A protein has these predicted regions:
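Alpha-helical transmembrane bundles and membrane-interface segments of multipass inner-membrane proteins
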Residues: 1-186
Length: 186
């Protein structure tokens, strides 16, 4: 069983904070038309996400704040870039709306599960779909070199994200709508 602490200042959490601070940098690079630099920065940010998770697990630096902050940083980065790309005409509006609805439902399900004393952990399929979504976002930065194929990458990633969401909802349905064992009904 993994050990969790209340400590905030450790390497994984600092890497997560760096990711949060780099969101406006990535967005600004995109808006200013510096797509290659924006893409490189986005990829580096994604690599810090992998690194902080690895360090946290390997060296027992998992914290309660990190468990919450890490996925928030991931979502904020992805959504910020997707919104920016939509405003720039790089990503169709329906893709952004689909991702917003999915993330809103995930947030609602997680909040309901938490209210009932449960947690809804992510799984490998969800992590793979998130990786592919980030890959498609990175491809959007390099669309000058990829042509329209970056959109096909995004559509495949979006399809997998939707499948992962459906699977997540089915697997976690009971956790979302039932009280944890030992909890009293109100």
């Amino acid at each position: 069983m993994e050990q969790r602490s209340n400590q905030f200042w450790n390497i994984p959490n600092v890497l997560t904070l760096i990711r949060l601070l780099l969101i406006p940098v990535v967005v600004l690079l995109a808006v200013k038309g510096q797509m290659t630099w924006g893409g490189i920065t986005f990829i580096l940010v994604c690599m810090t996400d992998l690194l902080d998770g690895y360090i946290a697990r390997k060296y027992g630096m998992i914290t309660k704040v990190g468990i919450w902050l890490d996925p928030v940083a991931d979502k904020l980065m992805a959504i910020s870039v997707i919104i920016t790309f939509t405003a720039m005409g790089v990503v169709p509006l329906w893709v952004t709306i689909t991702l917003f609805v999915k993330d809103g439902l995930l947030l609602l399900g997680g909040a309901l599960a938490l209210k009932n004393g449960n947690s809804t952990p992510s799984d490998l399929f969800g992590k793979i779909s998130a990786f592919l979504l980030n890959t498609s976002i990175a491809a959007g930065f390099f669309r000058e070199y990829l042509g329209q194929s970056y959109l096909y990458i995004m559509y495949v990633a979006l399809g997998l994200v939707i499948l992962a969401f459906i699977r997540y909802a089915i697997l976690n349905w009971k956790l979302i709508f039932t009280k944890a064992s030992g909890e009293k009904e109100e």
